[in-house]
A protein has these predicted regions:
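Non-catalytic terminal/accessory segments
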Residues: 1-288
Length: 288
């Protein structure tokens, strides 16, 4: 926790992590054991959004709440992380927007239509009852679920006024990202089932793409064989030709687009943004 950005920022109680002691931790553990633990409301602040004049609300938890949230996150990750979809890239260990782009580069080939989705106010709109029922499918410990329920209902303070939270998981909470992924895993499951029912037939290679790939292969082989013997100008010209060949190959679909016997769907999600690639008709994409 101490290594994360904003870890030393205090919540509504004015306490920060640098004042943490063994006595405070022991008292926190005892309050959880006795079921008397009650999270403080988060201190709401607003931060700038990139490429926008709007500001994003951010909840800053109290120090004790940060510790509890981190432990809850670790438990949830141990339960859910092994079963999350490979198409999910947001807020996950060893995954990022870079892994999402890598999946798109590798799997979204020959796509004829794209369906793009952005879930508006995602973190603020999760149904609490729906989320807990999803958790209950895998977790039998009602005391643990009750602890998460308290976190969801803790509310927030803004301009010294208390506000209830009726839905969503507050941005800034350490447990919000994993809860969001658990909630949205239902979308991932839906996309996977849709893919199984939609996909049919076998793809046919695009001959023009194959010719471009072969040309690129020979250019690269020629460059490697002659590189040491070329002068600077020859090397620049060789790299230019190789780059042109790469760009041309990437501009072509690897599969034939007019194969009506073949349909395919691919899906990728990063947090609340998702992308569906469709090889099929416009009607297929519209229905999806």
């Amino acid at each position: 926790i101490s290594q994360s950005q904003g870890s030393m920022t205090s919540g509504v109680d004015g306490k920060s992590l640098d004042g943490m002691s063994e006595k405070r931790i022991s008292a926190l553990i005892e309050s959880i054991r006795s079921f008397s633990y009650q999270p403080n409301p988060a201190r709401r602040v607003y931060i700038e959004k990139k490429n926008s004049t709007k500001k994003r609300p951010l909840g800053i938890p109290s120090t004790e709440d940060k510790l509890v949230q981190e432990v809850v996150k670790m438990i949830l990750e141990s339960i859910y992380e092994p079963n999350f979809s490979d198409c999910s890239h947001g807020f996950r260990p060893k995954r990022s927007c870079h892994s999402a782009l890598q999946q798109i580069q590798n799997q979204f080939t020959g796509i004829t239509w794209f369906v793009e989705g952005d879930i508006h106010a995602c973190f603020d709109s999760f149904g609490h009852h729906v989320l807990v029922n999803i958790l209950r499918e895998r977790i039998e410990d009602e005391n643990f679920l009750a602890l998460i329920w308290k976190m969801l209902k803790a509310g927030y303070m803004e301009q010294w006024a208390y506000n209830c939270t009726f839905s969503g998981t507050p941005q800034g909470s350490g447990v919000s990202p994993i809860l969001a992924n658990i909630y949205l895993s239902k979308l991932d499951d839906f996309a996977e089932n849709l893919k199984k029912s939609f996909n049919k037939g076998k793809s046919k290679e695009n001959l023009e793409y194959q010719r471009a790939a072969s040309k690129l292969y020979y250019i690269r082989r020629k460059n490697r064989a002659n590189w040491e013997n070329w002068n600077e100008q020859q090397r620049k010209e060789a790299l230019r030709l190789q780059k042109d060949a790469i760009n041309y190959m990437h501009s072509l679909p690897s599969k034939r687009a007019n194969n009506k016997e073949y349909k395919s769907l691919v899906y990728c999600r990063y947090a609340d943004d998702f992308l569906i690639g469709v090889i099929g008709s416009f009607e297929d994409a519209s229905e999806i």
